[in-house]
Amino acid sequence: MIYNFGAGPSVLPKEVLKKVQEELLDFEKSGMSVMEISHRSKSFQEVIDEAQSNLRDLMSIPQNYKILFLQGGASTQFSMIPMNLALGKKAYYAISGAFGKKAYDEAVKLSQTLDFEAISLGSTQSEHYNHLLKIDKSKVDEKMAAYLHITTNNTIEGTTIFPENLPEVNSVPLIADMSSNILAVDYDVSKFGLIYAGAQKNLGIAGLTIVIIREDLLNQKESLSSMMDYRILAQNGSMYNTPPTFAIYLAGLVFKWVKEQGGVKKLEAINRQKARMLYDLIDQSDFYQSPVLNEAERSICNVVFTSPSKELDALFVQKAEEKGFKSIKGHRSVGGMRASIYNAFPIEGVLELVKFMKEFEEENK
């Protein structure tokens, strides 16, 4: 049996893959693959409308928010967000992981040519991002603030800002990169001005990025590039140009699957159960360590851990691969191991990994 612990692209629900296989050559008796039908066709309009409706239901997205299906990966949002929201203002960033730093660095680069200021509220980089940044609200100029940017789940480092720990910044829009825990943890969308997520972790396949934006934040000026303008993209129903049709279709199937599993709250409970099995073993062991400083900040999507040495880490990864545990090697910047156990990852795979970890410890301690 193969278990895919990849951080993204990652495991997809078997039911979704079977549905794709079933419809691949003939979508809804059209005689064409969904990859072949026009994005302007009635058939595809129904696909994108249903996907949008199901996502709105799953996340309880208020009606004053637009849902956009975009290209370019979540990293493109590092540029689009300040371009659309920050002109003439101050853009604040809380940096608790590598992707948060990338978002900030991109804003700094843009601020050299565009009229806004990119401001870091601090970083935990010097501690290897082993904990989340404590945000000092007094450093935020509310009158001039365009937004505060956070990353809800740090895929590489294995930390999460859970809903109860979201920063409260009054009227300042909260912007969140939710790429690795959207639909895996239940957040109140109304607390955010904008949410974005690459699809290849919990939503589907690479090539699609979801943006959920409050309508009052849509850019009112026409000076931006049309392809980078949320307002134009929203006005055109995510089809200003040809969208990633197959990725949208597949995400729509994932949304249906999430509903069939009982919704986000139900999956979050299952994800917590899966993560707890691994963290319990790590905490009870003198062999394995979690690099995350605070237990309350541990991710339930990306469980990061190490053994007593880099040599044992390498041996663990080798033996794990031989056992069918794929892509469990930690990110190159961190090392160790990382078990990404997103929504579609089966609980049986976690049980098998726990068994393997115990055996490996006995053989190598």
From Swiss-Prot:
It is an enzyme of class 2 (transferase). Catalyzes the reversible conversion of 3-phosphohydroxypyruvate to phosphoserine and of 3-hydroxy-2-oxo-4-phosphonooxybutanoate to phosphohydroxythreonine. The modification N6-(pyridoxal phosphate)lysine is found at K201. One of its GO terms (molecular function) is pyridoxal phosphate binding. It catalyses: O-phospho-L-serine + 2-oxoglutarate = 3-phosphooxypyruvate + L-glutamate; 4-(phosphooxy)-L-threonine + 2-oxoglutarate = (R)-3-hydroxy-2-oxo-4-phosphooxybutanoate + L-glutamate. Belongs to the class-V pyridoxal-phosphate-dependent aminotransferase family. SerC subfamily. It comes from the Bacteria. Its EC number is 2.6.1.52. Gene3D superfamilies: Aspartate Aminotransferase, domain 1, Type I PLP-dependent aspartate aminotransferase-like (Major domain). Pyridoxal 5'-phosphate binds at A74, S75, F99, T155, D177, Q200, N241, T242. HAMAP family: SerC_aminotrans_5. L-glutamate binds at R40. Binds 1 pyridoxal phosphate per subunit. Homodimer. InterPro entries: Aminotrans_V_dom, Aminotrans_V_PyrdxlP_BS, Pser_aminoTfrase, PyrdxlP-dep_Trfase, PyrdxlP-dep_Trfase_major, PyrdxlP-dep_Trfase_small. This is Phosphoserine aminotransferase.
